[in-house]
Amino acid sequence: MLVISRKINEKIKIGDDIEITIVSVDKNQVKIGIDAPKNIPILRSELIEQITQENKKAAKEVDITVLKNISDIFKGN
């Protein structure tokens, strides 16, 4: 991991298209601004983890009856 010290309004450039700006620094919080092309997803890691957990939970809760009914439709029953 690369660790860089920055002050408010200083920037970090990643490649040609991504720029990170330090917007503010408080006691336990740093606010950053990210300029990147719209086709590059920018997500907080805790949201990715939450979505992953919800998807796993939903997959476990699939009703077997529903799956059988879908299977019957494709079989022509």
From Swiss-Prot:
Q: Which domain of life is it from?
A: Bacteria
UniProt GO BP: bacterial-type flagellum organization; mRNA catabolic process; negative regulation of translational initiation; regulation of bacterial-type flagellum assembly; regulation of carbohydrate metabolic process
Q: Where does this protein chiefly localize?
A: cytoplasm
> What is an example of a Pfam family matching this protein?
CsrA
Places the protein is found: Cytoplasm
Protein name, as recorded:
Translational regulator CsrA
Q: Subunit notes for this chain?
A: Homodimer; the beta-strands of each monomer intercalate to form a hydrophobic core, while the alpha-helices form wings that extend away from the core.
Q: Which GO terms describe its molecular function?
A: mRNA 5'-UTR binding
Question: Which cysteines form disulfides?
Answer: none
The protein's job, in short, is: A translational regulator that binds mRNA to regulate translation initiation and/or mRNA stability. Usually binds in the 5'-UTR at or near the Shine-Dalgarno sequence preventing ribosome-binding, thus repressing translation. Its main target seems to be the major flagellin gene, while its function is anatagonized by FliW.
- Stretches of the chain forming a coiled coil according to its record: none
Give the family per the record.
Belongs to the CsrA/RsmA family.
UniProt keywords, alphabetically: Bacterial flagellum biogenesis, Cytoplasm, Repressor, RNA-binding, Translation regulation
Mind telling me which GO cellular component terms the entry cites? cytosol
